[in-house]
């Protein structure tokens, strides 16, 4: 679809972003607001679809790859659809293709070509993507007001009924036939954020303490890595694996984005690029001196954003609170003469940014 010329695109100053989500490979992302939604190519940022409604806003949105189908839920000051109703929107026909209604608000939606995952505050429903949708399963969860869940490949993860634990469900044909469900005892306090690698083999999670990020295998629940984001309590808003799964970006309310090297095996040495505290090997010191720290980080000017990788070295942030797109790249530092051989090898720098209102 042709991108409208810049001078005819309406300003978003009077329609702040309500939510944003990358598609399954982060090649595109969608934002929703008080009058509709937009779809962009991620990098370079390019507007592809703009839909505005006269009768209300969209509060939750999820793309299905690059198809004409999007999952939407009403939101904002005047929701277009009831907030307990999930609509599969056919943008080619500009009308709903499917809908599902629930007894409580829909907080999150995850899609594949064959499944629809609907997240409520205390339940997760899985449906076959068919007309009409047929329900595959319903699972009770711990209180989940942020709609925390992740879906990749045939694997879906979400908080279990016990705070701090993560439920892993295999949605493959074999997994459904054998009812393959695993529980990961990930944290002592409630889970605040989860994400999956592209193949669904690794889940990254953090609790509402926001100090540690743990990586577990979804096949056997083994702990693969423990990363330290920081020492102070923080709210981790979003995490995302790079396309190969060898790096993990973490965004928190501390105005910092961290990137961890996840390439080392659990049985081997820690990721070569990650740092360790200088006191990490001193006996009898608190555990927060141990563990791996990010190998690059950057100060960011934003609070609530979502992450997507456009390449192995490029991370894009869509800031919901600031209505801004930013691109950060991992680059090699230039050697400083006379500084010795052990200079840091990489840094995370902001390469580009654009405000949505300026399009």
UniProtKB/Swiss-Prot annotation:
Repeat keyword on record: yes
Keyword Transport: yes
Chief localisation class: membrane
Keywords: Cytoplasmic vesicle, Membrane, Protein transport, Repeat, Transport, Vacuole, WD repeat
Alphabetical list of InterPro entries matching this protein: PROPPIN, WD40/YVTN_repeat-like_dom_sf, WD40_repeat_dom_sf, WD40_rpt
Example of a GO biological process term: autophagy of mitochondrion
Subcellular location as annotated: Vacuole membrane; Cytoplasmic vesicle membrane
Topology of this chain in the membrane: Peripheral membrane protein
Top-level taxon of origin: Eukaryota
Coiled coil residues, start to end: none
WD repeat start and end residues: 186-225, 231-270
GO molecular function: phosphatidylinositol-3,5-bisphosphate binding; phosphatidylinositol-3-phosphate binding; protein-macromolecule adaptor activity
GO cellular component entries: cytoplasmic vesicle membrane; cytosol; phagophore assembly site membrane; vacuolar membrane
UniProt note: domains: May contain a beta-propeller domain involved in specific binding to phosphatidylinositol 3,5-bisphosphate (PIP2), leading to the association of the protein to the membrane.
Family: Belongs to the WD repeat PROPPIN family.
Functional summary from the UniProt entry: Involved in mitochondrial or peroxisomal functions and amino acid signaling pathways.
Name of the molecule in the record: SVP1-like protein 2
Annotated organism of origin: Yarrowia lipolytica (strain CLIB 122 / E 150)
Source taxonomy: Eukaryota, Fungi, Dikarya, Ascomycota, Saccharomycotina
Gene: HSV2
